[in-house]
Amino acid sequence: RVRTLLLTPYGLRTLSPADANYRSLYEGSPEERDSAYHQGTVWPWLLGAYGDTLLFALWDRPAAARHLLGTITPLCTAHLREYGVGSVAEIFDAAPPYRPNGAVAQAWSVAELLRVLKKMRRAAPGVYRRWEAHLREETM
């Protein structure tokens, strides 16, 4: 259910779209933004815990790595080039096109992304190398 309700290419939603309190967009007045902050907003740093769980729960580590790396490709390509310029935003809207918001550069988002990428590289080096080569092709 996490994969279908919470996972996005930019992180995990803080609330399921099925919940009555879900807010898909982080916008409006400061009060409106504050009320949306934990009501569906996507947090990139949660990808670390998600990746840890995949590796723990699945026997097939290459499949876990393929799933996570394939999911987060937009975060590791277009977002890093176009918005964060080498960094990761604090939060994203919970609905496509997953507009970045909050702080332009969030240290714990960057740290968790780097940590889980390193963990995936160790768990499935072949999968990681192919994904990395794909990223290089995309940026050319």
Protein language model regions, located:
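Extended glycan-interaction surfaces of carbohydrate-active proteins
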Residues: 1-45, 74-140
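Acidic, serine/threonine/proline-rich low-complexity intrinsically disordered regions
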Residues: 53-67
